């Protein structure tokens, strides 16, 4: 039997037939492209080269090429899955802005006390994304931010509730490494705002806790201040000992509000 590029194309398509892969044949260039149906990422196989190998090794040449294509496409799929695990992490503004190797991290300003970093999660651990890793991922900073916020919205949440002196405190502590990151879920914040009757105070003292409080009196402010300081001191990855009043999508550090209150009180007394 004489092997031709067209016959080789048919042989390879038989071995590479999967519902998640598409095959396209360019008869002019004698190239077979096998790509993922969803992402369109794939491999181009020059058929004359495979035919030449077949003349020497026969069926073994076809098996080797098919194996190479399969492994490459599977690796691409795994890489895409890992990219789907890009998540935001909250850190203090004093946290380093670059890796130990000197590569700047991808960051976004958040509040006066916090900054958003981005992590490539591999289930067991994660690595903060710096400019070097960004190039390897072949993503833009904007794409990383969009993917991270999208994935943050998919994180589940279940609060424990405690009421002290009329003030209600909601605690989120799943220990998945992203408890503080839930502060970026705007729909979560809006839903909590609707159920809160007093001031909505939010705190992320360390990586593994998110506190949302319904503060109705001054005692509540004292409690949240002490609570946040305690969690901050005990946290494995501390973020900030300050808490924030959340209103209309903005976070206002409570110490600033306290200063403003003192100024107002002083003017009234005068």
Swiss-Prot record:
Xref: InterPro entries = DUF1444
Q: Where is the signal peptide?
A: none
User: Family per UniProt?
Assistant: Belongs to the UPF0354 family.
The identity of this protein, by name, is UPF0354 protein BcerKBAB4_4524
Q: Which organism is it from?
A: Bacillus mycoides (strain KBAB4)
Q: What is the lineage of its organism?
A: Bacteria, Bacillati, Bacillota, Bacilli, Bacillales
């Amino acid at each position: 039997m004489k092997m031709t590029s067209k016959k080789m194309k048919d042989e390879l398509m038989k071995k590479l037939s999967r519902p998640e892969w598409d095959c396209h044949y360019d008869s002019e260039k004698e190239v077979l492209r096998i790509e993922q149906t969803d992402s369109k990422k794939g491999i181009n196989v020059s058929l004359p080269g495979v035919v030449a190998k077949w003349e020497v090794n026969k069926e073994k040449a076809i098996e080797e090429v098919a194996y190479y294509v399969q492994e490459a496409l599977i690796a691409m799929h795994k890489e895409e899955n890992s990219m789907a695990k890009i998540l935001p992490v909250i850190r203090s503004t004093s946290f380093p802005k670059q890796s130990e190797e000197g590569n700047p991290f991808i960051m976004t300003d958040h509040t006066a006390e916090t900054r958003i970093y981005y992590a490539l999660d591999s289930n067991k651990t994660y690595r903060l994304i710096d400019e070097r890793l960004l190039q390897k991922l072949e993503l833009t900073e904007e794409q990383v931010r969009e993917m991270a916020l999208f994935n943050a919205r998919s994180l589940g949440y279940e609060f424990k509730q405690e009421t002290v002196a009329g003030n209600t405190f909601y605690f989120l502590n799943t220990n998945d490494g992203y408890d503080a990151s839930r502060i970026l879920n705007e729909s979560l914040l809006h839903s909590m705002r609707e159920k809160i009757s007093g001031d909505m105070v939010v705190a992320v003292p360390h990586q593994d806790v998110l506190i949302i409080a319904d503060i109705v009196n001054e005692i509540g402010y004292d409690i949240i201040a002490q609570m946040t300081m305690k969690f901050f001191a005990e946290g494995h990855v501390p973020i900030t000992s300050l808490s924030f009043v959340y209103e209309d999508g903005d976070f206002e550090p409570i110490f600033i509000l306290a200063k403003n209150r003192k100024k107002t009180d002083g003017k009234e007394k005068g």
